């Protein structure tokens, strides 16, 4: 028996939404629809739109029993006594369908058309040389993504799609049904690396130069900017500019040898070893800052431009002092924010006219810069947030499964990603990520609750299986041995991971090699107990940081601008077959919305924190390449400069 679309949940007065569902049922849509019987993991393809899900934003510590799942034939979830007390006291409420939800989440299945990796099976960021948790693409598939689309594919773009794209072009939000129409022919994650390579190889500079020569000086873009000023703004700018990258976006070097640790080509080819693992204690985070130091932005990787052309364009202006800010992107963001504050203070103290500093912040860099904006507002003249997320649940993939750097699987292991403090700053505060594909309910979890991590197994370092293993080993150890091991752990807590030391393994009576059936990336250096303590501290520290980023009406903020992507299908969450699927790590069935391939267009900073912005510039570039879109960056600077001028005129009128 097949599930039916929830047309009865759509408001009667919303004729378009109803008609859209009806049309999708009758037309030759390629959208897949799930059968209730998922025993073999197969999809029953129907010519229907997937059912919508919704509900109010809820994160609670009570759970309602999943009666619908029993009615639909699913086996009742089995939970042990340690599973949140049968998971009913700690799992956030599963939200029933609600047509009045202001932000309906959609469950969308895609066909195999488009430049998206259909073999992708886990969340990832798809950054350069990282997050490649999918099977190797065939040469034919790679060639297909590089070649232009055929005329038949362009025919698919009907009038309705163009209308939706125009709404996105005008930075207008689109409904869930419109997202279905726009992205129903896509599947999988966007290949941001390939997109960045292709954009880097395009002759944008030459094309823009020709356009500038032939352009009417009074001609305007669709969003009201004079085309001639898109070129002249680079000469209007004056003062100090600091540009910073995001997650994995700064060069890291060995403090002693000055050798490049991130990212060396040899490491990606498995020709050398790189150790980016941080210990579980606060002292370990302090120690690693003495051993590994940042050294500027990662401006490009081979042919992939990230910010090199932008910096070159800014440097061409003699009235600008452009500096890069590199930071250790593994650390807690409050540490990086303090380092940025120190740098900005040094620049500010040298200014004769205390105007402050312009900041261009890409991705996670926006989270760092925003903290400085809150704490030391006077240092900042303006910020351009480039694809900066207020949340990004994609991080759950690297934490749970690890990810690769080219052909190297040992750099970003499950343990390394778990102990990267910065990873947790992407966790969704609204708890939204997982959707039940059968009952059409949304599972909203408090991702800042350690019990959620343990029960759902969001990291193998703190899951129930490892807890049981630690408990069994503890029962086998003699009391004296336990005391010796505990003392040993205390003495070595701030230097090396105790459980990885051979002498400690001998004390524990474990002289055997690691069992062959244990994967190499699940042989952990840190004990279960230490991992849990670390998780509790880190979640609390992260939550406090994120809570400090909201708009303060009592402060006078400088002009803030946003450059973001809204043309690339972007993962919003995963459809799962019950909570057991989450425990088993079956994050393989995604639902999407417009974004830059990493950050959804509704997750953006600072907008989601209640901040007004002087402009919100939509770009067609992917996440990695957003700063290479010089036209969009020029628009952002124009808006900031004009806002400054208007502010000065306003103050002059007030004083007079």
UniProtKB/Swiss-Prot annotation:
Keywords: Cytoplasm, Mitochondrion, Phosphoprotein. One of its GO terms (cellular component) is mitochondrion. The modification Phosphoserine is found at residue 39. It is found in: Cytoplasm; Mitochondrion. GO terms for biological process: lipid metabolic process. InterPro entries: AB_hydrolase_fold, LACT/PDAT_acylTrfase. Residues 22-36 have a biased composition (Low complexity). The keyword Cytoplasm applies. Present with 1230 molecules/cell in log phase SD medium. PANTHER family: LECITHIN-CHOLESTEROL ACYLTRANSFERASE-RELATED. This is Uncharacterized protein YJR098C. It comes from Saccharomyces cerevisiae (strain ATCC 204508 / S288c). The lineage of its organism: Eukaryota, Fungi, Dikarya, Ascomycota, Saccharomycotina.
């Amino acid at each position: 028996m097949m599930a039916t679309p929830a047309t009865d949940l759509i408001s009667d007065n919303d004729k378009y939404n109803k008609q859209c569902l009806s049309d999708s049922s009758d037309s030759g849509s390629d959208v897949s629809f799930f059968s209730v019987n998922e025993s073999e993991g197969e999809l029953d393809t129907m010519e229907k739109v997937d059912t919508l899900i919704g509900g109010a934003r809820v994160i609670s510590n009570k759970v309602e029993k999943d009666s619908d799942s029993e009615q639909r034939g699913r086996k009742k979830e089995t939970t042990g006594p340690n599973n949140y007390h049968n998971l009913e006291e700690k799992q956030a409420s599963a939200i029933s369908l609600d047509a009045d939800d202001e932000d309906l989440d959609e469950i969308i299945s895609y066909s195999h058309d488009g430049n998206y990796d259909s073999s992708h099976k886990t969340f990832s960021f798809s950054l350069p040389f990282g997050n490649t948790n999918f099977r190797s693409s065939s040469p034919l598939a790679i060639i297909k993504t590089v070649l232009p689309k055929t005329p038949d594919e362009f025919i698919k773009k009907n009038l309705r799609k163009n209308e939706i794209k125009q709404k996105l072009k005008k930075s207008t939000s689109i409904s869930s049904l419109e997202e279905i129409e726009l992205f129903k022919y896509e599947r999988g994650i966007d290949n941001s690396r390939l997109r960045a390579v292709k954009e880097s190889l395009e002759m944008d500079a030459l094309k823009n130069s020709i356009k500038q020569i032939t352009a009417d000086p009074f001609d305007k873009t669709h969003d009201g900017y004079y085309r001639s000023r898109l070129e002249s703004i680079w000469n209007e700018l004056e003062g100090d500019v600091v540009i910073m990258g995001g997650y994995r976006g700064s060069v890291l070097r060995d403090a002693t040898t000055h050798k490049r640790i991130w990212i060396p080509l040899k490491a990606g080819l498995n020709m050398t070893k790189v150790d980016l693992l941080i210990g579980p204690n606060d002292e370990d985070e302090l120690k690693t800052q003495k051993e590994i130091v940042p050294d500027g932005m990662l401006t490009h990787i081979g042919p992939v431009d990230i910010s090199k052309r932008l910096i070159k364009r800014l440097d061409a202006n003699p009235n600008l002092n452009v500096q890069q800010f590199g930071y250790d992107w593994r650390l807690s963001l409050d540490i990086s924010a303090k380092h940025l504050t120190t740098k900005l203070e040094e620049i500010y103290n040298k200014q004769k006219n205390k105007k402050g500093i312009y900041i261009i912040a890409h991705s996670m860099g926006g989270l760092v810069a925003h903290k400085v904006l809150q704490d030391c507002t006077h240092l900042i003249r303006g910020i351009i947030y480039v694809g900066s997320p207020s949340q990004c649940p994609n991080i759950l993939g690297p934490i749970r499964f690890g990810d690769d750097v080219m052909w190297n699987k040992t750099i970003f292991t499950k343990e390394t990603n778990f102990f990267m403090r910065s990873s947790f700053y992407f966790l969704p505060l609204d708890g939204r990520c997982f959707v039940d594909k059968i009952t059409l309910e949304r599972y909203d979890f408090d991702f800042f609750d350690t019990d959620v991590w343990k029960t759902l197994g969001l990291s193998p370092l703190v899951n129930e299986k490892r807890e049981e293993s630690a408990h069994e080993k503890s029962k086998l150890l003699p009391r004296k041995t336990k005391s010796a091991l505990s003392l040993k752990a205390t003495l070595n807590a701030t230097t090396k991971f105790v459980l990885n030391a051979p002498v400690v393994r001998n004390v524990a009576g474990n002289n055997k090699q690691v069992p062959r059936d244990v994967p190499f990336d699940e042989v952990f250096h840190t004990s279960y107990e230490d991992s849990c303590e670390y998780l509790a501290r880190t979640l609390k520290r992260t939550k406090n940081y994120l809570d400090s980023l909201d708009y303060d009406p009592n402060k006078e903020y400088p002009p803030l601008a946003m450059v973001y992507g809204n043309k690339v299908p972007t993962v919003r969450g995963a459809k799962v077959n019950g909570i057991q699927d989450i425990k088993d790590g079956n994050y393989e069935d995604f639902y999407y919305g417009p974004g830059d391939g990493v950050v959804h267009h509704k997750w953006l900073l600072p907008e989601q924190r209640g901040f007004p912005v002087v402009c919100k510039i939509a770009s067609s570039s992917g996440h990695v390449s957003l700063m290479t879109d010089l036209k969009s960056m020029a628009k952002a600077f124009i808006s900031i400069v004009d806002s400054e001028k208007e502010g000065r005129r306003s103050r002059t009128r007030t004083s007079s």
